[in-house]
Amino acid sequence: MSILVYTESANNEFKKSALEALSYARALGDKMNESITCLAINCNDFSQLKQHGADKIIDVNNSSLEKFTSKHYSEVITEIVKTENIKIIILNSSANSKYLGAYLSGKLE
């Protein structure tokens, strides 16, 4: 079982709120004795994710994901949830992540 953190980025840099979500996930994972898996979309430098506690990083580079759409992003996350035995998903607090969270809750129920 694992905790998945969607680490939102812009211009190949992770948003501050995504790193805060990852730090929260690390603390939760430590309490629950669970590993932390990060999803990074169209990014190249993962050093910040490792510094903030990621155990595993799933790197998805796809030109169709350069512009955020909850449909496409939720398809990626849903596949990861199935293949990685994810039990908890943590999103940061942004308009895109809030929209994505609502979309995911319908897909994963």
Regions found by a protein language model. Give the residues of each.
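N-terminal glycine-rich FAD/FM-binding segment characteristic of electron-transfer flavoproteins
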Residues: M1-E109
